[in-house]
């Protein structure tokens, strides 16, 4: 059981954020705001959501993409982070698991996810 004051604080943190609904298996494009000195720029990270963890303001999601030379790159993003400029769902995937860690061992066509039609 969580403290009601902590829940109220977290609800206030979450309040103003517009976040689309996505699930594991979906391909998302996350726009990350990067500060370099006094300049800011936005960098996109596109990949498959392989896990969603936590609840409230501490909720995180893991995105995996295949980079150069077929090297898998995974990033864990806090869902309500100030550094996330936006999240866009590119494609909805049809999977039967909540955690898709098995994709780490798959390459090429074996790592494909069917599209969800709904």
From Swiss-Prot:
Keywords: Ribonucleoprotein, Ribosomal protein
GO cellular component term, pick one: cytosolic large ribosomal subunit
GO annotation terms (biological process): translation
Stored Pfam families: Ribosomal_L19
Gene3D superfamilies: 2.30.30.790
Domain of life: Bacteria
PROSITE patterns linked to this entry: RIBOSOMAL_L19
InterPro entries: Ribosomal_bL19, Ribosomal_bL19_CS, Ribosomal_bL19_sf, Translation_prot_SH3-like_sf
GO molecular function, one term: structural constituent of ribosome
Functional summary from the UniProt entry: This protein is located at the 30S-50S ribosomal subunit interface and may play a role in the structure and function of the aminoacyl-tRNA binding site.
Entry's family note: Belongs to the bacterial ribosomal protein bL19 family.
Name of protein: Large ribosomal subunit protein bL19
């Amino acid at each position: 059981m969580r403290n009601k004051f902590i829940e109220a604080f977290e609800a206030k943190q979450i309040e103003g954020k517009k976040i689309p609904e996505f699930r594991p298996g979906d391909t998302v494009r996350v726009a990350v705001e990067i500060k370099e000195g006094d300049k800011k720029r936005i960098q996109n990270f596109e990949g498959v959501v392989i896990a969603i963890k936590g609840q409230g303001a501490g909720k995180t999601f893991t995105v995996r993409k295949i980079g150069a030379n077929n090297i898998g790159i995974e990033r864990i993003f806090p869902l309500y982070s100030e550094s996330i400029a936006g999240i866009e769902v590119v494609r909805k995937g049809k999977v039967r698991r909540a955690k898709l860690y098995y994709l780490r061992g798959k390459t090429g066509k074996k790592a494909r996810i069917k599209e969800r039609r709904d």
